[in-house]
């Protein structure tokens, strides 16, 4: 496929994702990921689909792959952070959110606001766990 055809397919896949047709969107992004293995966006999109379908391990793997290809992919960072949060990996989640916020110091990307909110929730979870820990563990 040519670049314009890949873009057209990606736009179709995104539209299907937005409409909640995750199985069809998944097929498109799996095909695109095979066609262009160096494009991080396709893996980020797959991760978002897996996340929406509650396939957290598959989502984590897709976001990891996306971030290997593009370490500055804020969508992959925020979404991977959410996966970590849902898996109970609070520190990993907080790190991903912090990296996403660092990538957008002027807070122009809507994902950054989401990252800030989720980071605050992660920190609150850590602080609540520390407050409720037995005194022996706090030493």
Where are these regions (language model features)?
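Register position in tetratricopeptide repeats
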Residues: 18, 52, 86, 118-121, ...
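Canonical tetratricopeptide repeat
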Residues: 45, 79, 113-114, 118
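Alpha-helical adaptor scaffolds
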Residues: 6-72
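Long, contiguous interaction/recruitment modules in multidomain scaffold/adaptor proteins
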Residues: 1-5, 139
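Alpha-helical linker/edge segments of TPR/alpha-solenoid repeat scaffolds
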Residues: 92-95, 119-139
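Mid-chain, well-packed structural core segment of small domains
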Residues: 66-87
């Amino acid at each position: 496929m040519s670049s314009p055809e890949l873009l057209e397919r990606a736009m179709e896949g995104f539209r299907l994702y937005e409409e909640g047709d995750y199985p069809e969107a998944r097929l498109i992004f799996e095909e695109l990921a095979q066609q262009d293995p160096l494009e991080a966006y396709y893996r980020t999109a797959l991760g978002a689909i897996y996340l929406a379908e509650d396939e957290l391990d598959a989502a984590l793997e897709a976001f990891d792959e996306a971030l290997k290809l593009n370490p500055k992919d804020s969508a992959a960072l925020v979404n991977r952070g959410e996966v970590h949060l849902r898996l109970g990996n609070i520190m990993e989640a907080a790190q991903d959110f912090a990296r996403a916020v660092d990538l957008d110091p002027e807070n122009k990307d809507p994902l950054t606001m989401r990252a800030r909110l989720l980071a605050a929730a992660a920190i609150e979870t850590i602080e609540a766990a520390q407050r409720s820990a037995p005194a022996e563990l706090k030493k």
